[in-house]
């Protein structure tokens, strides 16, 4: 039995327009809006996983600026079974590519949202708390 689920994700800020925007993704399986994130692959660091997950879910090449926070909550593996502690390591990132390309299965939409409006769009309280760190 797994003791905890380890995951990592990225919070990408765009400051190229008049307002600061953050990138959110929609996952049809959960019908939620969140930050790009996912579980670590075997042998992968949290930093490597965060960069990989952002690229897989958004198509963006990004680099880590700094670690932002760890979010801890209970989750089910694949919607079934007992609740397991989950730890998500979040990193502030900047993009080195501009074209967003979502895979369509895990993520079907990626949207730049004004930082002041992101809390209204985000589904989970633990994600909304991360906005205070930006």
Model-flagged regions — what are they?
Residues 3-5, 32, 110-111:
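A residue-level structural signature of the nucleotidyltransferase/glycosyltransferase Rossmann-like core
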Residues 90, 94, 99-132:
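NUDIX/MutT-family hydrolases
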Residues 18-61:
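Conserved Nudix-box catalytic region and its N-terminal flanking loop in Nudix hydrolases
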Residues 59-98:
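Active-site segment of metal-dependent pyrophosphate-handling enzymes
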């Amino acid at each position: 039995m797994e003791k905890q689920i380890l995951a990592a994700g990225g919070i990408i800020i765009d400051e190229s327009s008049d307002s600061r925007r953050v990138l959110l993704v929609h996952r049809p399986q959960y019908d939620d809006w969140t930050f790009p994130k996912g579980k670590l692959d075997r042998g992968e660091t949290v930093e490597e996983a965060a960069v990989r997950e952002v690229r897989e879910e958004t198509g963006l090449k990004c680099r880590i600026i700094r670690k932002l926070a760890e979010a801890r909550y209970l989750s089910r593996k694949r919607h079934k079974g007992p609740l397991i502690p989950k730890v998500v390591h979040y990193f502030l990132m900047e993009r080195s590519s501009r074209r967003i390309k979502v895979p369509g299965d895990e993520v079907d939409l990626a949207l730049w949202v004004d930082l002041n409006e992101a809390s209204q769009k985000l589904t989970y309280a633990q994600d909304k708390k991360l906005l205070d760190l930006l």
